[in-house]
UniProtKB/Swiss-Prot annotation:
Its main location: membrane. The chain crosses the membrane at residues 33-53, 83-103, 113-133, 139-159, 188-208, 216-236. One of its GO terms (biological process) is proton motive force-driven ATP synthesis. Coiled coil: none annotated. One of its GO terms (cellular component) is plasma membrane. This is ATP synthase subunit a. The keyword Membrane applies.
Length: 249
């Protein structure tokens, strides 16, 4: 029995939309699950309503709203709430996409670097454009930390500038790598249990009890990671936006 933990990440075309020169434009499984994630979030927001006694959907929507709002206020202040639609959308999209990807035989959008890089670049250019538009040249004071001795200031400035422009890399790779590694580990453990059962029969299934228990534990951990990675992406977005809102702090 062959175990291929990488096959689950393959982007497969579902149907062709058209052609641009020699390049085929196709609707892929990645596109499909992006639409599914957006549809689930939209339905959650629309179905939550505004009842005096909140139901389950409204409770989920309200908890999500308050969680993101409190995260923004604690990291970027009340002025950061103007970015609430962006941060809330990013948090919900990543969280729902991650949770969908945990379901067997589905597709994990955030396990592809091109997707996480697009989200990280959106945050990066939002910070850069807003920071310059709001603060002018004062925005670049974030590259000059207070209290640094003059003789090492050029080195510190170089490090600060480098770290600023590397933010999209760390922001995107963190999410991508965690989701990729977790799903590969889950696939390997589950495949090992199945291989024992099919290869050794009843004896294999008995021997597979421990790996199966580890697979269940790993699956539960992946559910936690799905929420945690969405939170980490959102709070880093808040921290980066705080530089644009309060560049001198």
């Amino acid at each position: 029995m062959k175990i291929d933990p990488i096959h689950q990440f393959n982007i497969e075309p579902l149907f062709t939309i058209g052609h641009i020169g020699h390049q085929t434009i196709a609707f892929t499984n990645s596109s499909l699950y992006m639409l599914i994630a957006v549809a689930i979030i939209s339905l959650l927001m629309l179905a939550s309503g505004a009842q005096l006694v909140p139901g389950r959907l409204q409770s989920v929507a309200e908890i999500s709203y308050e969680f993101v709002a409190s995260t923004i206020r604690s990291t970027a202040g009340s002025e950061g709430m103007k970015f609430f639609p962006l941060i809330f959308s990013l948090f919900m999209f990543i969280c729902v996409s991650n949770l969908i990807g945990i379901i067997p035989y589905t597709f994990t959008i955030s396990s592809h670097l091109i997707v996480t890089a697009a989200l990280a670049l959106l945050v990066f250019f939002t910070v850069l454009i807003y920071g310059v538009a709001k603060n002018g040249l004062k925005f670049f004071s974030i590259f000059v930390p207070h209290g640094v001795p003059g003789y090492i200031l050029p080195l510190v400035m170089f490090i600060e500038i480098l770290s600023f422009f590397l933010r999209p890399v760390s922001h995107s790779v963190r999410l991508f790598a965690n989701m990729l590694a977790g799903h590969i580990a889950l696939k390997v453990f589950a495949g090992f249990v199945a291989m024992l059962g099919f290869s050794l029969g009843a004896l294999g299934w008995v021997g597979g009890v421990l790996p199966l228990a580890l697979t269940v534990a790993l699956y539960a951990l992946e559910i936690l990671v799905a929420f945690l990675q969405a939170y980490v992406f959102a709070i880093l977005t808040c921290i980066y936006l705080n530089d644009a809102i309060h560049p001198g702090h």
